[in-house]
């Protein structure tokens, strides 16, 4: 019987290798394939990877298609054994003192005690930028708003200089200001970048790429270009120019703190970046002498705070992860060898962008919803028969515990866990929203299963739909809505109906996010899906309608579509004067970023043995050295 091959770790930048600091041996299961070596900075460890060797004929005598997904990588007993010393009150007390001291740094800047009118704008922007990249900005919301209000006060159609009395604008301050102000919802136009082009329409630079100031300027230009809106040609020009410039720079110079920052941002961009991963990386380079603006900031205290916050959050992650693992174990899913077990990976994604300790319900709900969606994906795509799928879909629409009577045994357990978990999350949402939200959730799950039924019919009949038909259905079957809806309703952010309908399906926001994920996911999954008998994908449907195009042509076209959709989603999130605040949309937006992260190199949710496993190690299991 053929096994699903596990690809070796992709050849990537120095950055990715330096992020992997160590790993834990995983408890091997009885059936294993040759072990997968993973490189780390200090050593090489070996993890046993177990594959699901499901027989074509199941125990009930029914012939079924199989997925051959590798099994759970994270032993339940190993998860329960996790511990950390950072639960001690002394660490929280120290963090509280450091927060007060950092606030005093902001006060000194506001009072002009440590800066001058010649650098007061760039100083504020740099302070805000570093605090956000270190992952501690939640403690300084008022200070950040005050700093950005000040910068915006001096913003002009030509941008800004280093200070309010600089006399001339400069590209570094303007690019950093454009990015930071835009991300916080200020109405700033990218047209400010036009004045920094020469007579040939090119951004002006020196001929030798050795000046750290110029390199940092182009770096900030690249970062600004990542938050482009539709039809902003100057942002496209900025990204093309800065990408070429920075790649040439990285090829010429030795490893440094600045080059490591550039590598990280060029590797992860903004739409596949995760705040906790970025914070872990930035801690290793923060405070180096390549950051001259730091002269008025106590970088040691700021860095200590970031490290303490990172490690204190570990205790929260471990507590929540143990809960998730118990839920997975008690659900009986651990006995189902025909489905993917990615509960740990999904929780990790949530904890890498929802990093406020108070958002525990969001993280837990996200992990559970994602895992349930994945279990149903594997049932509808491969394991279930058409008759079973019709019965299960009808049972979910009844939404009654007695609806399991007509289901096969394996489906009874899945239905019960789905019913209980969705109702449980609805009760959590009722406390935070002050109203019953179960109907929102039920409608989302019904639409999800209806979209799967359509795909199952395509598989059973050998039908290859039109691209538009597949794409519209695929935006629902990806599962973005079911993974987003109940988690955001569990938060302490109010979502009245008029705001929720601007975020939930079929809103423009939801359609764009789901479209990005369906297109990107298909570029990573279509070959493996086709091998399992799932012929319909964005690639195959588009090729059918455009027979003159090669597979490579179509994949490149799909990537271009994703780039365009990302710009549109940027606008939906950040457009000024919107009746839906950014804070209400941010977690729904970050869910899209998190899923996108998993598709950066491959289908990280089917083959979770490489980058996604590294992410668990770096952000959940290993504390940062103090």
UniProtKB/Swiss-Prot annotation:
Enzyme Commission number, as recorded: 4.2.3.111, 4.2.3.112, 4.2.3.16, 3.1.7.11
Pathway info: Terpene metabolism; oleoresin biosynthesis; Secondary metabolite biosynthesis; terpenoid biosynthesis
Note describing how the cofactor binds: Binds 3 Mg(2+) or Mn(2+) ions per subunit.
Keywords for this protein: Chloroplast, Hydrolase, Lyase, Magnesium, Metal-binding, Plastid, Transit peptide
InterPro entries for this protein: Isoprenoid_synthase_dom_sf (IPR008949), Terpene_cyclase-like_1_C (IPR034741), Terpene_cyclase_plant_C1 (IPR044814), Terpene_synth_N (IPR001906), Terpene_synth_N_sf (IPR036965), Terpene_synthase-like (IPR050148), Terpene_synthase_metal-bd (IPR005630), Terpenoid_cyclase/PrenylTrfase (IPR008930)
Enzymatic reactions: (2E)-geranyl diphosphate + H2O = (S)-alpha-terpineol + diphosphate; (2E)-geranyl diphosphate + H2O = (R)-alpha-terpineol + diphosphate; (2E)-geranyl diphosphate + H2O = (2E)-geraniol + diphosphate; (2E)-geranyl diphosphate = terpinolene + diphosphate
Binding site residues for Mg(2+) 1: 377, 381
Pfam families per UniProt: Terpene_synth, Terpene_synth_C
Transit peptide endpoints, chain numbering: 1-38
UniProt short sequence motif DDXXD motif, positions renumbered to this chain: 377-381
Cofactor(s) needed for function: Mg(2+); Mn(2+)
GO cellular component entries: chloroplast
MF terms in GO: (4S)-limonene synthase activity; hydrolase activity; magnesium ion binding; terpene synthase activity
Localization: Plastid, Chloroplast
Residues bound to Mg(2+) 2: 377, 381
SUPFAM superfamilies the record matches: Terpenoid cyclases/Protein prenyltransferases (SSF48239), Terpenoid synthases (SSF48576)
Gene3D superfamilies, per the entry: Farnesyl Diphosphate Synthase (1.10.600.10), Terpene synthase, N-terminal domain (1.50.10.130)
Domains: entry comment: The Asp-Asp-Xaa-Xaa-Asp/Glu (DDXXD/E) motif is important for the catalytic activity, presumably through binding to Mg(2+).
Similarity comment: Belongs to the terpene synthase family. Tpsd subfamily.
Protein name: Alpha terpineol synthase, chloroplastic
Organism of this sequence: Pinus banksiana
Gene for this chain: TPS-Aterp
């Amino acid at each position: 019987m053929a096994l699903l091959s596990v690809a070796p770790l992709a050849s990537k930048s120095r950055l990715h290798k330096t992020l992997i600091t160590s790993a834990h041996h995983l408890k091997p299961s009885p059936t294993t394939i040759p072990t997968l070596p993973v490189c780390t900075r200090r050593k090489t460890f070996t993890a046993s990877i177990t594959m699901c060797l499901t027989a074509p004929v199941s125990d009930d005598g029914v012939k079924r298609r199989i997925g051959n997904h590798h099994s759970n990588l994270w032993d339940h007993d190993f998860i329960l054994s996790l511990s950390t010393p950072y639960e001690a009150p002394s660490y929280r007390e120290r963090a509280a003192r450091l927060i007060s001291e950092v606030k005093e740094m902001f006060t000194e800047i506001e009072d002009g005690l440590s800066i001058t009118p010649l650098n007061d704008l760039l100083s504020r922007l740099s302070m805000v930028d570093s605090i956000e990249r270190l992952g501690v900005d939640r403690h300084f919301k008022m200070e950040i708003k005050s700093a950005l209000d000040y910068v915006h006060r001096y913003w002009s159609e030509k941008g800004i200089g280093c200070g309010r009395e600089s006399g001339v604008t400069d590209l570094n301050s303007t690019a950093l200001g454009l990015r930071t102000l835009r991300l916080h919802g200020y109405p700033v136009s990218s047209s400010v970048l036009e004045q920094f082009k020469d007579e040939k329409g090119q951004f002006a630079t020196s001929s030798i790429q050795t000046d750290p100031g110029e390199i940092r300027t182009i770096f900030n230009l690249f970062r600004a270009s990542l938050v482009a809106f539709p039809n902003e040609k100057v942002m496209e020009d900025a990204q093309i120019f800065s990408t070429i410039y920075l790649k040439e720079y990285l090829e010429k110079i030795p490893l440094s703190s600045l080059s490591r920052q550039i590598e990280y941002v060029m590797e992860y961009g903004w739409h596949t970046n995760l705040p906790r991963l970025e914070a872990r990386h930035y801690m290793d380079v923060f405070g180096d002498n390549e950051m001259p603006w730091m002269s008025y900031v106590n970088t040691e205290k700021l860095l200590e705070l970031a490290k303490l916050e990172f490690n204190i959050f570990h205790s929260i992650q471990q507590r929540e992860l143990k809960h998730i693992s118990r839920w997975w174990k008690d659900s009986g899913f651990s006995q189902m060898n025909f489905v993917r077990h990615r509960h740990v990976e999904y929780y990790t994604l949530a904890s890498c962008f929802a990093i406020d300790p108070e958002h525990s319900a969001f993280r837990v709900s996200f992990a559970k919803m994602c895992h349930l969606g994945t279990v149903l994906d594997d049932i509808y795509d491969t394991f279930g028969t058409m008759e079973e799928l019709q019965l299960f879909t009808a049972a979910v629409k009844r939404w009654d515990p007695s609806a399991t009577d007509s289901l096969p045994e394996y489906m009874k357990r899945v239905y019960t866990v789905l019913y209980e978990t969705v109702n449980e999350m609805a009760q959590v949402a009722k406390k935070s929203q002050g109203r019953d939200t179960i109907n929102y959730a039920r409608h989302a799950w019904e639409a999800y299963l209806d979209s799967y039924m359509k795909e199952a019919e395509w598989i059973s009949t050998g039908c290859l739909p039109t691209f538009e038909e597949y794409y519209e259905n695929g935006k629902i079957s990806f599962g973005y809505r079911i993974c987003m809806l109940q988690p955001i309703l569990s938060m302490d952010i109010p979502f009245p109906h008029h705001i929720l309908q601007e975020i939930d399906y079929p809103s423009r926001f939801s359609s764009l996010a789901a479209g990005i994920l369906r297109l990107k996911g298909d570029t990573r999954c279509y070959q493996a899906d086709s091998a399992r008998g799932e012929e319909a994908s964005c690639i195959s449907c588009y090729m059918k309608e455009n027979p003159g195009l090669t597979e490579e042509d179509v994949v490149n076209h799909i990537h271009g579509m994703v780039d365009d959709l990302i710009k549109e989603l940027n606008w939906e999130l950040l457009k000024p004067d919107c009746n839906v605040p950014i804070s209400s949309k941010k977690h729904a937006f970050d869910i899209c970023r998190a899923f996108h992260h998993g598709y950066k190199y491959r289908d990280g949710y089917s083959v979770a043995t490489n980058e996604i496993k590294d992410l668990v190690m770096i952000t959940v299991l290993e504390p940062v050295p103090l």
